[in-house]
Amino acid sequence: LAQYTGRVAENEIADIEQLFDYKINGRFQFIIYNKLTDFEQSNIGLGSEDLNTNTGGLTKIVGNKVLVYYDGDYRHFKEQLRAGIAQVLINQLLYGGSVKERVQSAALINFPDWYIKGLITYVAKGWPLENDNQLRSLIIDKGVKNFNALCDVNSTLAGQSLWNFVIARYGPSTVSNLIY
């Protein structure tokens, strides 16, 4: 599993760095757990102000450490890796690498929750058919009329749908322009 992670992560890092037009400072560290329960019991990052969780709430990020678990599904594992890599890159891109830079930048940069979560989810999963169906259901069945209402119901899906639209309409090169 560690060898698989190394091979996949190398390709995914290059792919995501190209999408964001940004090279990571330093190295990634991947901590892999054999199952979800081991992952949930981990105390890595507890008490750290630097602890983030991604959109699924399951990939922990501590600095450049990405904590993931393997549940028997390589597709899901790869999504966790991509989400973790995207989160680390976005954190470095927006807030800098050191704790001091992050504190200084956090006061200046304030993106809505759906914006970053949607981007991370889009990078990790793309726009699968079930998202299309879920969005259609919210609009038709639940009567969601506009983007703000969608953000209230499902902010991650709202952000993911926005990034899907932007990339489909204007191309992947626009991602870095909208983040900087």
Can you annotate each of these PLM segments?
Residues I16, F111-D132, R136-Y180:
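Active-site-proximal alpha-helical
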Residues L1-A106, P112, L129-E130:
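Juxtacatalytic substrate-recognition/specificity segment
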